[in-house]
């Protein structure tokens, strides 16, 4: 009996001591205390960066507008981190005299979510297959890309005879 009473008496003494103390300020772990654990904030809602890296292959249609300006439309497909398999359209305007262009990327994921970006780029036209470097700023999207931001670089090769392009993309998407 004595071994049973000792823990009960110790627990009662501990409880009485805890209850006799005056209330303290809420801790950061208390509900509603403004801490992050229980304050209603969610890590899923906090902006976070994800890597964006992939490859693309496609066809190119070039239409003269008012030389040296040409409308160029790329229709491509590929695969990238976080996006998965995608289709891609890239309408843009190119000044063939300066080898500079500007336009938009629209990636469509397999589930229909879209990621959009605006870019500027330059081409090295000194060889039969042009080397093109583009820098893009992500402007948003739909589905899981709604409100997305970030940036990426595209490095492509364009064969003007075959009217094809291949390339890589690499950067980050900031999910909001």
Where would I find each of the regions flagged by the language model?
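Beta-strand-enriched cores of mature, soluble protein domains
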Residues: 22-176
């Amino acid at each position: 009996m004595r071994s049973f009473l000792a823990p009960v008496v110790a627990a009662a003494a501990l409880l009485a001591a805890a209850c006799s103390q005056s209330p303290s300020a809420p801790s950061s772990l208390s509900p509603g205390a403004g801490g992050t654990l229980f304050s209603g904030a969610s890590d899923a809602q906090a902006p976070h960066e994800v890597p964006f890296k992939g490859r693309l292959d496609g066809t190119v249609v070039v239409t003269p507008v008012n030389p040296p300006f040409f409308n160029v439309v790329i229709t491509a497909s590929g695969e990238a981190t976080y996006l998965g398999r995608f289709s891609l359209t890239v309408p843009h305007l190119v000044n063939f005299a300066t080898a500079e262009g500007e336009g938009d990327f629209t990636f469509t994921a397999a589930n229909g979510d879209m990621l959009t970006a605006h870019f500027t780029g330059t081409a090295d036209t000194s060889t039969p297959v042009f080397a093109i470097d583009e820098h893009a700023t992500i402007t948003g999207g739909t589905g899981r890309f709604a409100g997305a931001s970030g940036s990426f670089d595209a490095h492509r090769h364009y064969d003007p005879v075959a009217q094809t392009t291949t390339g890589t993309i690499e950067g980050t998407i900031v999910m909001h």
